[in-house]
């Protein structure tokens, strides 16, 4: 599943394609959304917001399209009039004079009014987004030590979108390697230096992944700036200590770690 950096880059691509341009055609696959098609013709996208792995497309008439790609959803940008050859099922089409954005295969799609943005179940539950520039290590540290999260093992906590939105499996293993901790650690057991390092890594690594513009299915992000240190590198030597990276399963997801320097 794409993680926060990949979702934010998708939002950037959608904004670059149609932001501020009048919509000339709108189509929704789901019957409950059909009534909004005519309401959006002539309107424009004001901005595209991410909340972890959810995407909010805001329109000039104050409506907001909520979509969560889950495992299979994908957005594509095409020239208007182009019909991509794909076996995926089209769910949403937002067309302007020159560019069209298409959402395929997603099933979690809703249209929200302003007052619903604060009451939507997912948006209520999701924690602060790691890519939000206003989120600071101090706030992250407070969340780590809060009664709700301080007793949780990091293996599960770092996948919980209620803790911090936008984290996922590759970020989980890279963050824990960076700070030399395992998935079994808990915030309550860390000393001040460990806690500070973790709070910074929880923001720095996702932001580095996003800023250096890479692809999750390559072994690097945006050129050679971000490299996986442990993710999908089981059997290889750790670049920090030389021990062999191992793979196990934690919280039902593959977990990669170095037994030599994560303890």
Curated annotation (Swiss-Prot):
HAMAP family in the cross-refs: Endonuclease_8
Annotated keywords: DNA damage, DNA repair, DNA-binding, Glycosidase, Hydrolase, Lyase, Metal-binding, Multifunctional enzyme, Zinc, Zinc-finger
Cofactor note: Binds 1 zinc ion per subunit.
Protein name (database record): Endonuclease 8
Cofactor requirement: Zn(2+)
An example Gene Ontology molecular-function term: zinc ion binding
Keyword DNA damage: yes
SMART domains recorded: Fapy_DNA_glyco, H2TH
GO biological process, any: base-excision repair
Membership in a protein family: Belongs to the FPG family.
Function: Involved in base excision repair of DNA damaged by oxidation or by mutagenic agents. Acts as a DNA glycosylase that recognizes and removes damaged bases. Has a preference for oxidized pyrimidines, such as thymine glycol, 5,6-dihydrouracil and 5,6-dihydrothymine. Has AP (apurinic/apyrimidinic) lyase activity and introduces nicks in the DNA strand. Cleaves the DNA backbone by beta-delta elimination to generate a single-strand break at the site of the removed base with both 3'- and 5'-phosphates.
Any one Pfam family match given in the protein's UniProt record, by short name: zf-FPG_IleRS
Entries under NCBIfam families matching the protein: PRK10445.1
Gene that this sequence comes from: nei
Top-level division of the source organism's lineage: Bacteria
SUPFAM superfamilies in alphabetical order: Glucocorticoid receptor-like (DNA-binding domain), N-terminal domain of MutM-like DNA repair proteins, S13-like H2TH domain
Binding-site positions, DNA: 70, 125, 169
Its EC number(s): 3.2.2.-, 4.2.99.18
Catalytic activity line of the entry: 2'-deoxyribonucleotide-(2'-deoxyribose 5'-phosphate)-2'-deoxyribonucleotide-DNA = a 3'-end 2'-deoxyribonucleotide-(2,3-dehydro-2,3-deoxyribose 5'-phosphate)-DNA + a 5'-end 5'-phospho-2'-deoxyribonucleoside-DNA + H(+)
Keyword Flavoprotein: no
Catalytic center residues: 2-3, 53, 253
Zinc finger (FPG-type) boundaries: 229-263
